[in-house]
Amino acid sequence: MNFGTLADIETRGKTVLVRVDFNSPIDPSSNTILDDKRFREHIPTLQALEDARVVVLAHQSRPGKKDFTTLAAHADKLERLMNMPVTYVDDIFGTCAKHAVRDAHPGDIVLLENVRFSAEENLTMKPEDGAKTHLVRKLASMADLFVYDAFGTAHRSQPTITGLSYAMKTVAGLLMEKEVSMLSRVFTSAPKPVTFVLGGTKVDDSIAVAGNVLANKTADKVAIIGVVANVFYLAKGIDIGEPSRNLIHMLGYDDEVAKAKTILDSYPDKVLLPEYVAVKEHDERKEYPITRVPKDCPILDMGTESIVQFSKALRNSGSIVFNGPAGVFEEAKFASGTFELLRAAANVDFSVCGGGHTAAVIEQLGLEPQYSHLSTGGGACIEFLTGKKLPAIAALEESWKKFGN
């Protein structure tokens, strides 16, 4: 990754645009931010820019959603976390925004309005086209430098994500730098053996990751859990029962069965599948071998014998990349697979979690300090692990070529 970082630039007295990802769960009735984790992740970058005029760019949700709102509550939250005043401007690039930025002093933080209030920001476009938008040209004219720190949106190509990097000198913020460094380590220097644990309901993403890390020999083993495992069972010709089969169809993953079969045929010794599962039968947890699942009972977790087997395999790993739960952990009866595997994964030398629900469970279990890295970007992390270059990373590299030293 050949892009600039904060260590490569002088920021004292400069006006610096910083793109963050403050997109958070919000209670629409009270406009209260329910989780400030994403704010906390960006604090080190903002603190590192204490000698500059900092102009923060962020979004909240998207048009049409109930939580698509102004960033007034975000300014209050940031003010409390930074323990300093934050100037909120309900404007993105108009006269009010320009005046607020012009009047700021080094050490000040200005938070502009939700960038998705600008129609241009909601369009996917090439970076060179993004650089020509009114949004980017107006923002770039207000500042000397751009710091991109929003890993959670790095898999998108929209004006403030990739266009600004083509319009002005841009470097990665501390969070972005950390994410790329830790996730790159999975491919370059992770202690062996490396086990990927792929679960949850995003079957297409998990199968793409499995195919990539097995083909390039990044993974020594791939443990398949959750709904992803159900697709692999179908690929083996196993009857998983009507409810689980219907769920795969409803989620639109029928075509993934053939891809799962290709992986099983190509890497028969490298794919781990639970042999025992837990189903909901008469509202109770009942465990069966996968070949004897009752026809009308949904599979909601791994069985105890498989939890023990998988936990042992994880503890014998040097590195683990964990993405997605083993079952419906929101129901206490079906949480043990997810909880126990996450506990086992916490004990290895190098452990990475792909973000999203899994990261939330790790925090809930108090395991966060034991993990090497919890990614802040679910979709971006997955796309990175499939081997694709994220648009924001490509734009950072292009900016450094164009404007860097």
From Swiss-Prot:
Keyword NADP tagged: no
Where found?
Cytoplasm
So what does this thing catalyse? (2R)-3-phosphoglycerate + ATP = (2R)-3-phospho-glyceroyl phosphate + ADP
Task: Detail which positions bind ATP.
Answer: 330, 355-358
Q: In which pathway does it act?
A: Carbohydrate degradation; glycolysis; pyruvate from D-glyceraldehyde 3-phosphate: step 2/5
Q: Name one Pfam family in it.
A: PGK
Q: Which domain of life is it from?
A: Archaea
MF (Gene Ontology): ADP binding; ATP binding; phosphoglycerate kinase activity
Q: How does it assemble?
A: Monomer.
Q: Does the keyword Disulfide bond apply?
A: no
Which keywords accompany this UniProt record?
Answer: ATP-binding, Cytoplasm, Glycolysis, Kinase, Nucleotide-binding, Transferase
| GO terms under cellular component | cytosol
Which species is the source of this protein?
A: Methanocorpusculum labreanum (strain ATCC 43576 / DSM 4855 / Z)
Q: Which PROSITE patterns match?
A: PGLYCERATE_KINASE (PS00111)
Family under the similarity heading: Belongs to the phosphoglycerate kinase family.
The UniProt annotation places substrate binding at 21-23, 38, 59-62, 116, 156
EC no. given is 2.7.2.3
Q: Name one GO biological process term.
A: gluconeogenesis
What is this enzyme's class at the first EC digit?
transferase
Q: Which gene is annotated as encoding this protein in its UniProt record?
A: pgk
Q: What is this protein called?
A: Phosphoglycerate kinase
